[in-house]
Amino acid sequence: MAFTGATLTTSTIAATAASGPLMDYLWMLILGFIIAFVLAFSVGANDVANSFGTAVGSGVVTLKQACILASIFETVGSVLLGAKVSETIRKGLIDVEMYNTTQQLLMAGSVSAMFGSAVWQLVASFLKLPISGTHCIVGATIGFSLVAKGQEGVKWSELIKIVMSWFISPLLSGIMSGILFFLVRAFILRKTDPVPNGLRALPVFYACTVGINLFSIMYTGAPLLGFDKLPLWGTILISVGCAVFCALIVWFFVCPRMKRKIEREIKSSPSESPLMEKKNSLKEDHEETKLSVSDIETRSPVSEVGSATVPLRAVVEERTVSFKLGDLEEAPERERLPSVDLKEETSIDSAMNGAVQLPNGNLVQFNQAVSNQMNSSGHYQYHTVHKDSGLYKELLHKLHLAKVGDCMGDSGDKPLRRNNSYTSYTMAICGMPLDSFRAKEGEQKGEEMEKLTWPNAESKKRIRMDSYTSYCNAVSDIHSASEMDMSVKAEMGLGDRKGSSSSLEEWYDQDKPEVSLLFQFLQILTACFGSFAHGGNDVSNAIGPLVALYLVYDTGDVSSKVATPIWLLLYGGVGICIGLWVWGRRVIQTMGKDLTPITPSSGFSIELASALTVVIASNIGLPISTTHCKVGSVVSVGWLRSKKAVDWRLFRNIFMAWFVTVPISGVISAAIMAVFKYVIL
């Protein structure tokens, strides 16, 4: 349907340009419009993940909501900001004056460049590999020029500047995102009560976002809106005025409403999270309670307490986290051992057998059924949730809502630990038999299902029951309780940091529920800002060669001074939106979830700083890569949160893809250009 519309559009365009001096090459113009639409489709399927990937990954918006918002802002951004970068792509990379007497070669080169870029981006989207659309079109443009005119046809000085920008853009974006997140964490996230400072900062955040966005639109000089006639001082005055007005609106209307909403959420959920069950028990000082295991066996899992003696305080708050993931079944009551409440000064070895009281007075209970398993089978059983599974998304979303200390769970819950090698969260599900991990009805079980190894095996073996909606399971031999404790300590990274609450913060640096509410709207706004900037910058990747093709056909002048037509930018924006709806979810999953866990606060920092970098580059006509900016910001903020929170293996793969994209798209474009030059023309 979309391609039929593209064909009808090209027919209409061809009819209006029928009086041009190159009427014999009308077929090339029509072919160029079709390929340009495919290229725009591929840009939407791959590059749009940069804009809303983090918002979807943090759970702030759904995929459908992201597609709707991106469709609006990508299109508007392509119309208002895209013209200037299109000029750089059209004239900045090659010397178009060399084609004065061979206009048909320039037209063929434009078609070749679009084809080479589109093919490689479609392949990359199929492989869920985020690449740079700017890299593609630059490499393809150089490829056809080398075939058409040799090395003299390329402006190598401009190419060097562009290559430098590919490395400078992630560095600058990363620095800006890191500074912003550092300030947010220092003045908001790390406060005992983050709400007051967060509400005070809201007007500033909104004002900066709106002011920068408006300045970008007006400074670019969108002819459609008459902004090209505004002087610089007028642009600055209008932008600052609108930013101040927005700040006042937020301060007097949005902040009070947000404060009331947060208060309602806290009142309706005393535990500060819908996942938590908070129990307030009044107990007298110096009172000691001793319960035997036989007495506990008849109690519910939530009230299970071991035989340890604990001095109880006047008011003790016990918080537990309950996760319900997929079709998981709780272990039978008889397979669970009771939790034990221990003193705050206890070692990690003792903590593995009971519960720990955090410095803030909260009593966190640990799930404990390992001893029972070891006594019966001599094995320690654990299951890993794969980062690409459906459960990982649900688990990650719930981790964002739960506070750090509460994520350890109670006697019926699953303690969480970090698996660095896969960059995924791990559930140590104690007391749960392997056969409780059953594939859902209709799930694929083909070659992805490997031979099962049951807990009574003598040697260490890995079990894989893994597709995108199932689990990675593992079974390890552990012959003594001390060995088990050492392995768990090493896996959690606690080491000798006994009783350290900062180690928990390092692993579970998640937003508090009220902070999540505070930053949700901001992340949506900054994501829209990023989508707007992306539309302005990356629509040129699809439309730049088409603009050259159309203007050469229409005027016969390779160095035409005619401004980029607005309807051509709109044409590219529509293609980008369709690509997003049809195929965008593949790369969104890679960018938004796999590189590093995203929270609303970190997502806001990533979006605002990277979008600011892209918009500035668009305004000075420098074709940078939005992929590089976003990856640089994600890695920078993830590294600040925890060095082990970043999937460095995935980052390495993305970094390698930055280098292979230019030559691959260039080779494809050069091959098509050779066919045009030596066979067709």
Curated annotation (Swiss-Prot):
Residues 269-296 are annotated as: Disordered. It catalyses: 2 Na(+)(out) + phosphate(out) = 2 Na(+)(in) + phosphate(in). InterPro entries: Phos_transporter. Pfam families: PHO4. The modification Phosphoserine is found at S269, S273. It is a multi-pass membrane protein. Its main location: membrane. Keywords: Cell membrane, Membrane, Phosphate transport, Phosphoprotein, Receptor, Symport, Transmembrane, Transmembrane helix, Transport. One of its GO terms (cellular component) is plasma membrane. Residues 275-290 have a biased composition (Basic and acidic residues). The chain crosses the membrane at residues 25-45, 66-86, 106-126, 162-182, 207-227, 234-254, 515-535, 562-582, 604-624, 654-674. One of its GO terms (molecular function) is phosphate transmembrane transporter activity. Residues 554-562 are annotated as: A. It is found in: Cell membrane. One of its GO terms (biological process) is phosphate ion transmembrane transport. Signal peptide: none annotated. Sodium-phosphate symporter which preferentially transports the monovalent form of phosphate with a stoichiometry of two sodium ions per phosphate ion. May play a role in extracellular matrix and cartilage calcification as well as in vascular calcification. Essential for cell proliferation but this function is independent of its phosphate transporter activity. Ectopic expression of feline SLC20A1 in guinea pig cells which are not permissive to Feline leukemia virus subgroup B (FeLV-B) confers susceptibility to FeLV-B infection. PANTHER family: PHOSPHATE TRANSPORTER, SODIUM-DEPENDENT PHOSPHATE TRANSPORTER 1. Belongs to the inorganic phosphate transporter (PiT) (TC 2.A.20) family. This is Sodium-dependent phosphate transporter 1.
